[in-house]
Amino acid sequence: MSAQEIIRSIEAEQLKSNLPEIYIGDTVRVGVKIKEGEKYRVQPYEGVVIARRNGGINETITVRRVFQGVGVERVFLLHSPRIDNIKVLRRGKVRRAKLYYLRGRVGKATRIKQRFDRSL
């Protein structure tokens, strides 16, 4: 067994199997585990998926939302133990792999058409 095969087999054990199909342009709600003292709570973060990177254990999505007039982006490792759940709220109809152009837009210009041919 080569080193790469060993690494792949270890990573395969760590992958989450209950992730939904996530596409660019989707509006998602990510439940992030936050530790406060000794307790854990789940904080929801809702926004539009503007980028998706890599594959395997290091797969990430970038989620953007506007909060109090300021654009906020967070990068989430999909297979991280800190991610409690991911729920797709609506499907977006886009023709780009990365939606970085949304960074320069405000208000109604940031809206994305809804896609109905894919199930939630």
Curated annotation (Swiss-Prot):
It comes from the Bacteria. It holds the Pfam family Ribosomal_L19. Gene3D superfamilies: 2.30.30.790. GO terms for cellular component: cytosolic large ribosomal subunit. The keyword Iron-sulfur does not apply. This protein is located at the 30S-50S ribosomal subunit interface and may play a role in the structure and function of the aminoacyl-tRNA binding site. This is Large ribosomal subunit protein bL19.
